[in-house]
Amino acid sequence: MSSCKTTLSEMVGSVTKDRGTINVKARTRSSNVTFKPPVTHDMVRSLFDPTLKKSLLEKCIALAIISNFFICYWVFQRFGLQFTKYFFLVQYLFWRIAYNLGIGLVLHYQSHYETLTNCAKTHAIFSKIPHNKDANSNFSTNSNSFSEKFWNFIRKFCQYEIRSKMPKEYDLFAYPEEINVWLIFRQFVDLILMQDFVTYIIYVYLSIPYSWVQIFNWRSLLGVILILFNIWVKLDAHRVVKDYAWYWGDFFFLEESELIFDGVFNISPHPMYSIGYLGYYGLSLICNDYKVLLVSVFGHYSQFLFLKYVENPHIERTYGDGTDSDSQMNSRIDDLISKENYDYSRPLINMGLSFNNFNKLRFTDYFTIGTVAALMLGAIMNARFINLNYLFITVFVTKLVSWLFISTILYKQSQSKWFTRLFLENGYTQVYSYEQWQFIYNYYLVLTYTLMIIYTGLQIWSNFSNINNSQLIFGLILVALQTWCDKETRLAISDFGWFYGDFFLSNYISTRKLTSQGIYRYLNHPEAVLGVVGVWGTVLMTNFAVTNIILAVLWTLTNFILVKFIETPHVNKIYGKTKRVSGVGKTLLGLKPLRQVSDIVNRIENIIIKSLVDESKNSNGGAELLPKNYQDNKEWNILIQEAMDSVATRLSPYCELKIENEQIETNFVLPTPVTLNWKMPIELYNGDDWIGLYKVIDTRADREKTRVGSGGHWSATSKDSYMNHGLRHKESVTEIKATEKYVQGKVTFDTSLLYFENGIYEFRYHSGNSHKVLLISTPFEISLPVLNTTTPELFEKDLTEFLTKVNVLKDGKFRPLGNKFFGMDSLKQLIKNSIGVELSSEYMRRVNGDAHIISHRAWDIKQTLDSLA
């Protein structure tokens, strides 16, 4: 109902102890005069508690309030129900305007210019009246001036009013004018606020249906719950802020006391103006009259205008804007992105019925707005011909598929920076990838909500005769609530948080701390709670249509899954797994029954976890029963190697196929060549025998015959064989000689014959011009080198040296024609193996294979990804 409750609730809370029991000090706003405020009481006690002294104005106010009921009875008997309703409706509108506009103007001028205080000082309203009146004195009553007579009357009346109201020990002249002005101001506030409340209640009472059937239903039950909750909000708010805030005390003077957040002020921003008006809607539900609901909406909306144009400006001038370094972090990140990337511009964002940050030079903005315009115009022009069943399927499928797409991007981005890598490897920047994501996400929101609006609008239009006006208005209120939630969320976390910036630009985060400002002070995940209430509002607007219920469930589930299983794990990874209790959670846990339930749940959870841990320990104990050798990886590998050697060669003493230095080296790092020694009995040797190189995983199925092609990775055993294949075999066959019993030789597989893929390989010796296997070598490993990535210069040096040895570098540019086995994919794999990043083939072709550009680009990507880790 009043201001400083918002002032202190939003900015610093308020004292929770009674003013009379603690030593509260106050000071005037301009002169800084300190004083101890007197004990005051709340509005209801001041007016109706018979044990308290009553001033003349308080008695008049109480009589005016009570007279409303007699007037209501008389007007009802004389003019009937409808006239009486409108009579009190007009009264309510008058007092509501007097509240929001009248009190608003008074407080506005008091806040800016201390108008009431200066007026009291100028006319000495709270100064002592001398007994010997001087003709030149301000207190002279000899003058016939109406002005002086008027101010003399005001002076006497105000002093009499305060003396009759306050205890005898209250010294009127010992206090500064500010406190006395405030005490008089309270009287007029009591009149306006009580009249506003009583006339509204009478109007509502006259609007309640006479039929018991219309009263006793689910709407009335929900209405009573809202009213009871509203009463608790009012009582708890007054418990926290006391009279000082209830009557806008900080417009007159400032209290110096310990200020804390408590109770209802942990549940909602501006609780007296937000959830403090839920009783209005509870009464509207009981009445089931859309006219009452519209009046309630008017009263509530005018209160928000009062908050926006009177209280909030005063709050910011008196206490600051309430933001700290943590709450401004995301905003600073947005500024930093714009500063470091001259071609970056703020993304287009849809907020309700408007678009923010429209860029006339950005095509995607036209595309987004054009999509909305096309869908809306198409729906309006073809409303009669649209099949609602098909439209429902379209909305459902569009929402589900687009959500899966969005969720997949976020999940893969969180796990491996997939989306950023996709753009980096194609030559774009990290920020450019973020810009594309911003378009995708905003377009997803715009498209799905536009389709939902169209479908709901057509549902209402096609079945308007069955739509309940109250339900329609309540639905619009829920839509407005979701729109407000979105705006508050964006205000709290800025564009960076709205577009999941910590998924894409975590290297821009300087402080690993989640914001607890704005709406996040009350809810940990407002988008999961209030971010779908507008969709449920469409259920009300369409009179609980089954299709709208299905869509609302879909929206709710997808929102919940995204927050629970993608956003929350990522937030824990970036900011640490800290348990942050929301304001609502603190308040609920402060209630003793709920706190007891929470303790029971925690104890049960601890018991379950302990039992699972004990069971896990028992099951792990079975591993000790295994032989120790089987737990030793090195010995296990030796056993596997011996088993493979046992089938690698024939029993003949002259059958041999061995890799040189295989006892020393089983892992060949490219471009190191692999030399093979072979021996074959002379009676088995054929001049067309050949040796092929294969991946073990491809040939493991058959040890007698090779059933896969060598892909060119083969060599003859004799220089004179396979002459039609050019000089390749003359270079690979380095030695061959024959004796009476056997033939032996050496074959070297260099970069012109080797694979450029990491893996386990083997050589196979084939008989004649066939694929019959005579000998199989010991498996060995081929791996790409790990280049030096300490600096971009060293990385470029190692890369160019390797490409030169592989014969694919010419004039500093990659030319795969020099080696048919080392193509674009091999180069990509080499870079990925060395530096952990991948460049696309398209990008490398775009830069014409320039080794300098490729190496430096890969190194830059590595630095970017490292900064995101």
Swiss-Prot record:
Positions where N-acetylserine occurs in the chain: S2
Superkingdom: Eukaryota
Any one of the GO CC terms: endoplasmic reticulum membrane
TM region(s), chain numbering: 56-76, 87-107, 188-208, 213-233, 259-279, 292-310, 363-383, 390-410, 440-460, 464-484, 535-555
Sequence ranges on the Lumenal membrane side: 2-55, 108-187, 234-258, 311-362, 411-439, 485-534
Entry keyword Signal: no
Topology in membrane: Multi-pass membrane protein
Primary site of residence: endoplasmic reticulum
Function: Catalyzes the first step of the methylation pathway of phosphatidylcholine biosynthesis, the SAM-dependent methylation of phosphatidylethanolamine (PE) to phosphatidylmonomethylethanolamine (PMME).
Protein's UniProt name: Phosphatidylethanolamine N-methyltransferase
Name of the gene encoding the protein in the UniProt record: CHO2
